[in-house]
Amino acid sequence: MVDIKPSLRRYPFIGFTPDREVGNIVLTVEDLGYSQNGEQIFDHVSFSISPKDKVAFVSDHELAVTTFFKIIMGEITDYTGTFQWGVTTSQSYFPKDNNEFFDDCDLTLVDWLRQYAGDDAYEQDLRGWLGRVLFSGEEALKKANVLSGGEKVRCMLAKMMMANANVLVLDEPTNHLDLESIQA
């Protein structure tokens, strides 16, 4: 009988623990619309999200969901209609294109994460967050501007976990991820 070697695959630990519970209303959207270069991206969008809801946004229009997320996260301001986050919500956003967080960034991953944690964050804690997404030891000293697409996604997930938000806004988070990270 031949012994089977154990797998060398490592799985990240991805878990989100909010600092605070959400109240009775998470998000209310009323008659929201947006057009770009004369083209209506979406119009008359209205809904309300309650606690415990898990919502997926799907559209035939490539820009619609990403644009909607940018509006509710405050990145786009020239829209019609209104939206209101619940007073007890804190949001953490995973954008579809995360290159702006990494391109031209000459920081190590520890220092990259520190800019979102505050200058008083302990390096040991930052390394702990990075370790959860498989950047351990010397890998945590890798420069942020040389990461692959999947490594950038894992760093963004560490940033989001560290934020302890009670609302997650994820715009195509599994792009570039390896199978182990998707399963985690």
Which residues does each predicted region cover?
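ABC-family P-loop ATPase nucleotide-binding domain
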Residues: 2-26
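ABC ATP-binding cassette signature C-motif
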Residues: 19-184
